[in-house]
Each structure stands twice: as structure tokens, then as C-alpha cells.
Amino acid sequence: DKAFLYVGEGNVLAACNALVHEQDRRLKVPESEREMPVLFNEYCTTWGCPSEENIRAILQAIRSFGIGYFVIDCGWYKPDDKGWGNATGDWQQSATLFPHGIKAVADAIRAEGMVPGIWFEFEVAGRDSQAFSREELLLKRDGALITSKNRRFFDLRKPEVDAYISERMIDFLTENGFGYIKIDYNDTYGIGCDGAESLGEGGRQVADESLAWLDKLKAALPDIVIENCSSGGSRIEPKRMGMVSMCSFSDAHECAEIPFVAANVSRVIPARQSQIWAVLREKDTPSRTVYSLCAAMMGRICLS
């Protein structure tokens, strides 16, 4: 890997523009990304409870919009008696939410001319998952499991973790016909972990394995579109951004400050990679609707 430096006269914005231009020049994306299609993500419609029923209704409503990607966000795996946030890690589709299987929904999305996408947070196990108690798969520090309130972290360096994630994520994507993955990451294991000469080196190794999974995804599914999320824009850095198609710019869904956030993000990633929420509500005034759509035009439009 190489570090890129910029030296020149001018201000910080000029330096940022030069570095972003270099990132854009080096970017390699799937063929489906050439025309930078508009997305629809159902999160701000279902708020973590997607289902076959509500997705089919959404597909009917957006049929005429010319959307390229339809992303099923978090919650598709949640148990009947638990919330989505602490159920990450097992990655078993809900038979209640998807009685005909999630592949039937992915097929319905493709039948409407869109690439089906789905949300994963594959590096963590939530408290309500079985994986949360599988000590042999999880990171430790000073011999104790690293627990961040309701989450633990897979030790991505272990072959058995590699096999587990391959089965639960890559096989799932392949078998169900998904062409897009939204990778989220909403926590941190802190200063590092056991298993190396220092805690920091352990943490670095795990971070490297996280990046290696992007290559594994592309090797298994060469046309896969990868969205880098992480609580919105918490993993916006050149190495990772050079390995993905785009990035959720922020978890700012509906606030009036979206253009300011988007403008600042444009200093560090190319506009073609900056996915900006445009959440439209029936109660919105015409001026609010125009504002939401125009704000998203500072990058990639993600409707909800």
C-alpha cells in the first residue's frame, strides 16, 4: 500500500480536492455503478422491521421511479420476541417476516428491474444471538471477552470465524440472489485485543481482516456492490473507500443539516461514493420535498 501526499499553495479545500480527485481516479467499481443509479433503502419506512408484505407494497409504490438498487436494511433476521439491534450475529432470516423465504423477495425486486441489496453487520454478535455466547469465536482482552454493553466481536483472524461468516454471509448472498451488500459497524473493541505481541497489534490485525473480507466478497461475487456504512460515515478513510462502491455519508436521515454534513464529507470522498439520504414523507411541503431531494444531489441519492 502507498500513502498519497499533496504539497502545494492554497488552502485546505484545494488539498482535499486534489486528494479526492486521486481517490476517484483510482476507484474500480462494478459495471452496475457506471451510471450511478438511484437507490431505495427501506429503513426509514419500516424502521428495522422489513417483511415480505411491506416490501412488496413499497415495490408497487416506487415502480415508476427508475430506481437501480433496492436495499433491505436491518431487522430481516430478528427473532419474533427480540429487537433487531441485539440480534446480530446468527444471521438467520425470519420465517415470520419472510414466510416464503427472503429469496422470493429478492426475486420480486429483480423482477422490478432493480438489484436487491441487504444489510449485514458481520463483525459483531449481539447479546440476543447465540453467537454472543460462542467464546471460541470472539475477541478477548487480558483473557476476558470484550463486551461493549450488548455486543461482542468476532475474532476475524480465526479460521473457524472465517468459515462461520462465509456460511452465514457469502453463502446467504449467493443462494438468495443478492447483488448488493450494506456493511454496517456500530461499535468498537477499543484499544486492541489478545493474540499478538501487543493489544494494539492485535487490533490492527483484526482491522486488516475486516478489510480482507471486502476482497473475499468480491472474489465470491465479482459483481457485488458494497456499501460502507458504520453508523453512517464512521469508516470514511481512503483504504476502505478504495475497496467499496460507495459509503453512507451519515446516519442523518431527515434533519435540515444534511447539506452541511454532505458538503464536509465531500472533502474526503468522491461525490460518486457519497450516498445521501432523501427521506420523503407524505406530510412534507413541496419546498421540503425539493430541499430533501436537492440535498441528496450533492452525492448519490438514497430514497426512503
What are the residue ranges of the model-derived segments?
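Short Pro-Gly-centered flexible turn/kink motifs
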Residues: D1-N11
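Aromatic-lined carbohydrate-binding/catalytic grooves of carbohydrate-active enzymes
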Residues: E31-I170, N176, Y180, G190-I191
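Active-site neighborhood of glycoside hydrolase catalytic domains
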Residues: S94-G101, V105-A111, S133-V290, M298-R300
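C-terminal catalytic subdomain
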Residues: A295
